[in-house]
C-alpha cells in the first residue's frame, strides 16, 4: 500500500508500508477486559472540532527517578504490530503486543501454561473485543515487568492465540505521567517518566484526550470531524457506520468485503474502501484504506452516533518514530528522514 502525506507546509511526502496486509482477515486486538466480570462503559467526551485542545489542566505527579525506566529492542510482528519483551512473575521474556487500544493486559493459553499458574474460573473476566464479548478465565500475576518498569500485580485474562504469533497483549492504560517512545526505524522501545518536553523539530503533534484509559484524538476525515482511537494493537484502521454515512458522497461505490476477527474469535464483516483525505494534526494523509462496519465494540462504547475511526498500525507504523506523552496529552510523529526531505 502506498500513502501520500502532506505536511502543514504542503510539502509532498510519500512512503510505503513494509508489511503484508491480509485482505481476508484483519485481526483487531483493541479490547476491553474487566476483572471479575464487571464491565464499565468508556466515558465519551462530546464531539469537538478537529483542533488542538487549549487550557487542559494536567495533574502534577511526583516522579522519584527522572531516568528512563526501560529501553530495549522491539520488533514488529508479521502483520505490523509492535511487540515488547515482558517478564511475568520473573519468567520470560514473553512477546506481548504493545496495545494502546487495550485497557487491560492479557496472555494466551500457551503463555499461561508456561507460567505454571493455574487459571481461575472463580474470578472470570469479561473481555470485549471489536467483534464480540466473552467470559474467560484469569491467572494472577504478582509482577509484570518491562525492564525496570513495573505494571503488576494484575489478574490477566487468558485468551486464545489471536495475536499473530505474540504471546499476549500489553496494555498501557495505567500510564499517567509516562512517555512511550517507539522508534520503528531502529527497533527501539522506551517507556520513561515524562519530562513534559515539547516535540522536537520535524515532529508533527496530535493533541490527545483520555477516555477509559485509551488515547483519543479529534481528526478530520474528508472534512468530517471524527473521533479517533489510537490503537497500536490493530492491524487495520476501522470506521463506524456513522463515519461512512457522513462520507457517503466521497466514498466509492465499489467496495470489498473484509472479515474482522476479534480477541473473542468472533468474526464480523465490513466494507473495505479507500478513504478520503485524513487530517491528523498538521498532516494530511492520502491513500488510506479503511474498513467500515457496525462493529460490536462501537456499540458497546456507545460510539455509533458520532463518526469514529480506530487508527491502526497500517497508518501509525508508517512513521519513523511515534511518541505518546501521557503527561502532555499528545502524540508526536516523525516522518522518515528520506521522505521528509523531499
Please tell me what each predicted stretch does.
Residues 25-36:
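Bacterial N-terminal signal peptides
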